[in-house]
Amino acid sequence: MIVMDIFRYFASFVPAEVLKKTFRIPDSDEYNALMNGLLAEPSGREIDGITEYVFGIDAEKLATVISAVAGIYLFVEYDRISSTVNTATDRKDDRLHVAVTVACPVPDSKDLVSAAIINDRCLEILSSIRRRMREDDDLKRGIEWMDYPATLTVFASKALANSQGWSMEFDIYGIDIV
């Protein structure tokens, strides 16, 4: 279903050795199939500089995972689906709201210039993902990976290991995807 499609899609931007760390507790055949499928061969779309892939919505688990991160991480979360019916075509259109964040824990020992350099690198990685997303619509399945508008905002979270970076919010559009 669409949640795992999103997981797979954004995993394609993560180097395999980093992606391997995402799979912590294999507990089912479906889990193993997903892990083995993604790790079998590189996507060719990996972006250098990403040191962790974090996917989910559980605030406590996210905080635990991110507290152990030392470099730049790609964090993907989702939160709502809106559906409409196009009466002219009797087609259901769905939009899934997603936030994609590229951030890095910034220790208090870093000064503002160091933080700005980190923020600039995070924005560079997020912009690279955004550029690729514009070219990735899956017309066969009726999915637009980024339905504009997309909003980029500064991300700062003391609760997530004092992380700083950039976040992009947008909708994924699809024809009857849920």
Regions from the PLM with identified roles:
Residues 84-92, 155-162:
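Exposed beta-sheet edge/beta-hairpin loop segments within beta-rich domains
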Residues 89-95, 103-131:
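Extracellular/virion structural assembly segments
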Residues 83-84, 110, 176-178:
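Short, surface-exposed beta-strand/loop "edge" segments at domain boundaries and coil↔beta transitions
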Residues 1-89:
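Small/polar-rich, solvent-exposed N-terminal microdomains that initiate assembly or binding
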Residues 118-173:
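Acidic-leaning, charged glycine-interspersed low-complexity segments
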Residues 92-107, 161-176:
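Oligomerization/assembly interface segments of phage tail-like spikes and tubes
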